[in-house]
Design a protein with these regions (language model features):
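Canonical positions in the second alpha-helix
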Residues: 59, 92-94, 126, 158-162, ...
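TPR/TPR-like (Sel1-like) alpha-helical repeat modules
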Residues: 95-100, 128-129, 164, 298, ...
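Start-of-helix register in tetratricopeptide repeats
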Residues: 34, 68, 101, 134-137, ...
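Register position in tetratricopeptide repeats
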Residues: 45, 79-80, 112, 148, ...
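Single-residue signature of alpha-solenoid repeat helices
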Residues: 52, 86-87, 119, 155, ...
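Structural marker of alpha-solenoid helical repeat scaffolds
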Residues: 62, 93-97, 129-131, 164-165, ...
C-alpha cells in the first residue's frame, strides 16, 4: 500500500494533475502501470471509487499482465465486493505470480473462502523460496495477514519463525497477538515501549489506545489517541479510537464530533455513517440518525458484513419515530441476510412493539423467541433488557432474578440493570449487592448504565465505595 506521505508529495501531486488534465481534455497521455495503480489507490482512499476503478482498469487494459493494477482490482473485488472468484480472475492475469503482493492476495482469497489449511500450506511453500535477507519480512507479513483475519494462533505460530526478535516490526506483531488473545496488559506494555522508542509513530499510539480501551481504561485510551492526533490530525484510526472512547463515557456530542471527522476522511465504505447514526440515536435525534443510516445502506455493497447492523440501527431509528411497520420490515431484512441471530432479532421485534405501546404484540414475539431458542440465556437477557428499557421495573427485576439463576459461571451482563431495578424499587441491600457485582464483572456496562448517578470522572471500580461512604 502506498503511504500518505507519498500522496502528499510534490512528485505525486504533479503526476495526478497531469492525469486529471488529460482526462478532462479527453486526450491520450502515457502513465505507467505503477502510476495508474497509485492514482487508483489515491482516489479510493479519497472516497472516489469510480475514479479509482477507472484508473486501475486503464492500467489493466494498457499493460496486460502488469501486477499493480491487477492486484488493486483483485483486492477491491475481494475486500470490498466480497467476490473471491472475481479477485482470483484478476490475480491469474498477473505475469509474475511470485510477486509478494500476488502471494499475499492468493492467500487472502483462500482465507475468505475459509480454506485456512490450504492457505497455510501455500504460504509455507512460498517461504521456501524466500532469500535469507527477506525471510523475516515475509514471515511478519504473513503473521499480519493472519491477525487481520483474527487467526491469532496462526499468527503466533508464524511469528515464532522470526529470527530478529528485537525489531520494532516483530514487537508490533507480538503486541497485536497479545491483544488478540485478550492479554491486554502485556499488549499495553509492548506498545508503551514502542512509543517510548518511537514517540512520533502514530500507529504505535493507536495500538496503545486500543489496548487501554480493551482494558476498560477509557481515559488513558483517549489520552493516547490525543497524542496520535497531535502527531497527525487526519489519522483515521486515532480519530476513531477517540470517538469510541468518548462514546463509551457517554459523551455523545464529543463522540459525534470525532466520528464526523473520521467520516470526512474515511470515504471508502459505510463505517463512518453507521457510527454517526448510532451516536445520533443515543442523542435522541432519530430523524437525523435515519438519514445517515440510509446513506450507509446505499454505500454498502450487497454482501457487506455491516448490513445486519445497518438494518438493526435503522429499525431503532424508525421505531423511535413511531414507524412500527417500517421498523419491523428492517428487522426482517436483517434476518434475511442470514448473518444475524434470528432469535435475538425476534426479541428486537418485540422491543419495537413494546416501545410503541403494544405490549401484547411484544409478548408474542418474546414467547416466539424463547420457544425457538429453547430458553437460551442470551435471548432471555435481551427480553429482560427490553422490559427494563421500557420502564417495567418490577417485571424486569423478576426476569433478571430468573436469568441469574440459570446463566453460566462466566456470565457478566445485566448486573448494572438489575442494580438500577433494585434502586427504583427501594431494595437497598440488593441494589448495593448488584452494584458491586456489576462494577467487578463488567465495569464498561456499569459506566454506561450507572454513570449518570456518579461523578463524571469517577471510575466504575470506585462506584461501590462512593455510595457506601454517602450512607
Amino acid at each position: 500500500m502506498t503511504n500518505d506521505s507519498y500522496f502528499n508529495s510534490e512528485e505525486f501531486l504533479q503526476t495526478l494533475h497531469s492525469y486529471e488534465e488529460a482526462e478532462q481534455e479527453g486526450r491520450a497521455a502515457y502513465f505507467d502501470s505503477d502510476t495508474l495503480a497509485d492514482i487508483a489507490e489515491y482516489y479510493y482512499t479519497d472516497g472516489r471509487t469510480n475514479d479509482a476503478l477507472n484508473a486501475a482498469l486503464k492500467g489493466v487494459d494498457m499493460f496486460p499482465g502488469a501486477m499493480p493494477p491487477l492486484v488493486f482490482m483483485g483486492r477491491y473485488e475481494l475486500l470490498k465486493q466480497n467476490n473471491p472468484q472475481k479477485a482470483e480472475w484478476y490475480l491469474e492475469q498477473v505475469d509474475d505470480q511470485s510477486e509478494p503482493e500476488c502471494v499475499y492476495l492468493r492467500a487472502e482469497i483462500m482465507l475468505v473462502e475459509n480454506k485456512k489449511d490450504e492457505a497455510d500450506e501455500f504460504l509455507r511453500q512460498q517461504l521456501e523460496w524466500q532469500d535469507d535477507a527477506e525471510r523475516d519480512n515475509f514471515v511478519l507479513d504473513v503473521a499480519d495477514i493472519y491477525l487481520d483475519y483474527d487467526l491469532i494462533d496462526h499468527a503466533q505460530e508464524w511469528l515464532s519463525m522470526v529470527e530478529d526478535t528485537q525489531s520494532t516490526d516483530y514487537q508490533e506483531v507480538l503486541g497485536r497477538i497479545a491483544l488478540g488473545k485478550g492479554e491486554y496488559q502485556q499488549g499495553e506494555e509492548i506498545f508503551k515501549k514502542l512509543v517510548e522508542d518511537n514517540p512520533f509513530a502514530s500507529p504505535y499510539w493507536n495500538q496503545l489506545a486500543s489496548s487501554q480501551f480493551l482494558s476498560n481504561r477509557i481515559k488513558d485510551s483517549i489520552e493516547s489517541s490525543e497524542y496520535s492526533i497531535a502527531i497527525n490530525p487526519n489519522d483515521e484510526e486515532a480519530l476513531l479510537n477517540k470517538a469510541n472512547g468518548m462514546f463509551s463515557l457517554g459523551e455523545y456530542e464529543e463522540a459525534l464530533t470525532y466520528y464526523t471527522r473520521f467520516n470526512n476522511l474515511h470515504k471508502d465504505d459505510e463505517t463512518g455513517e453507521i457510527f454517526i447514526g448510532i451516536t445520533l440515536i443515543n442523542l435522541d435525534r432519530p430523524a437525523e440518525a435515519l438519514q445517515h443510516l440510509q446513506k450507509a445502506e446505499e454505500m454498502a455493497v450487497p454482501r457487506s458484513i455491516n448490513l445486519v447492523e445497518i438494518y438493526q440501527e435503522t429499525a431503532f431509528a424508525l421505531s423511535r419515530l413511531g414507524r412500527v411497520d417500517d421498523a419491523l420490515a428492517y428487522v426482517n431484512k436483517a434476518i434475511a441476510t442470514g448473518n444475524g441471530n434470528e432469535d435475538e432479532l425476534t426479541v428486537f421485534k418485540g422491543h419495537i412493539q413494546l416501545e410503541n405501546g403494544n405490549p401484547l404484540a411484544a409478548q408474542n414475539y418474546f414467547l416466539e423467541a424463547v420457544r425457538h431458542s429453547k430458553s437460551a440465556p442470551n435471548v432471555y437477557f435481551r427480553i429482560a433488557i427490553s422490559v427494563y428499557d421500557n420502564g417495567y421495573m418490577q417485571l424486569a427485576y423478576r426476569m433478571f432474578h430468573t436469568l441469574f439463576q440459570s446463566v453460566p459461571a462466566d456470565w457478566k451482563d445485566g448486573y448494572s440493570h438489575m442494580s438500577l431495578c433494585c434502586k427504583h424499587l427501594n431494595k437497598e441491600s440488593e441494589f448495593l449487592y448488584f452494584l458491586r457485582k456489576a462494577c467487578e464483572l463488567n465495569p464498561m456496562e456499569a459506566k454506561t448504565i450507572l454513570g449518570e448517578y456518579f461523578p463524571k470522572d469517577l471510575d466504575p471500580e470506585s462506584y461501590y465505595n462512593y455510595i457506601t461512604k454517602q450512607k
